[in-house]
Each structure stands twice: as structure tokens, then as C-alpha cells.
């Protein structure tokens, strides 16, 4: 590898707005980063995700093609 062309890759402490903190490695300038959402509070990872039906498109699709039974 060429010397002096790669960014500094170092440990960074990340703090989420929910209070969760963890350490990762990054090229971010600084030793501390604040984020709004992390895997501890994101709806996808917590299981609280909701499907948004915009304009009844899902209902119209299910009516047209039928909802498959599991």
C-alpha cells in the first residue's frame, strides 16, 4: 500500500439518542459520534415495524390477486 494516501482509521465511541453507546472503528474525524437511531431502538430491529399502506395499494393488490394463506 502507498503511504500517506489512506484516511486515518481509528476507534470511535458512538452514542445514540436512546442512550445506547458502543465503540466501532471509522474514518470519522473525532473520537465521539452522536446518532439518532441505532440497532437498539430502530423499529426494524425491535419488531415494532409497521407497514404503511399508501392509498390502499396493498388492499387493492390483495383484492385483485388474493392474499395467500400460510
From Swiss-Prot:
Q: Which cofactor does it need?
A: Zn(2+)
Q: List residues binding Zn(2+).
A: 16, 18, 38, 41
Q: Which GO terms describe its cellular component?
A: ribonucleoprotein complex; ribosome
Q: State whether keyword Transit peptide applies.
A: no
> What residue range is the signal peptide?
none
| GO MF, one example | structural constituent of ribosome
Specify the superkingdom.
Answer: Bacteria
This protein's UniProt keywords = Metal-binding, Ribonucleoprotein, Ribosomal protein, RNA-binding, rRNA-binding, Zinc
Q: How is the cofactor bound?
A: Binds 1 zinc ion per subunit.
GO BP annotations, alphabetical order = translation
Asked if DNA damage is a keyword of the record, the answer is no
PANTHER family in the record:
50S RIBOSOMAL PROTEIN L31, CHLOROPLASTIC (PTHR33280), LARGE RIBOSOMAL SUBUNIT PROTEIN BL31C (PTHR33280:SF1)
**Similarity comment: family membership:** Belongs to the bacterial ribosomal protein bL31 family. Type A subfamily.
Functional summary from the UniProt entry: Binds the 23S rRNA.
Quaternary structure?
Part of the 50S ribosomal subunit.
Protein name as it appears in the record:
Large ribosomal subunit protein bL31
The taxonomy runs: Bacteria, Bacillati, Actinomycetota, Actinomycetes, Bifidobacteriales
Amino acid at each position: 500500500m502507498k503511504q500517506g494516501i489512506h484516511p486515518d482509521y481509528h476507534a470511535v465511541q458512538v452514542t445514540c439518542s436512546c442512550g445506547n453507546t458502543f465503540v466501532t472503528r471509522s474514518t470519522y474525524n473525532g473520537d465521539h459520534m452522536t446518532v439518532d437511531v441505532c440497532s437498539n431502538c430502530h423499529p426494524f430491529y425491535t419488531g415494532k415495524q409497521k407497514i404503511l399502506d399508501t392509498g390502499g395499494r396493498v388492499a387493492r393488490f390483495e383484492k385483485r390477486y388474493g392474499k395467500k394463506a400460510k
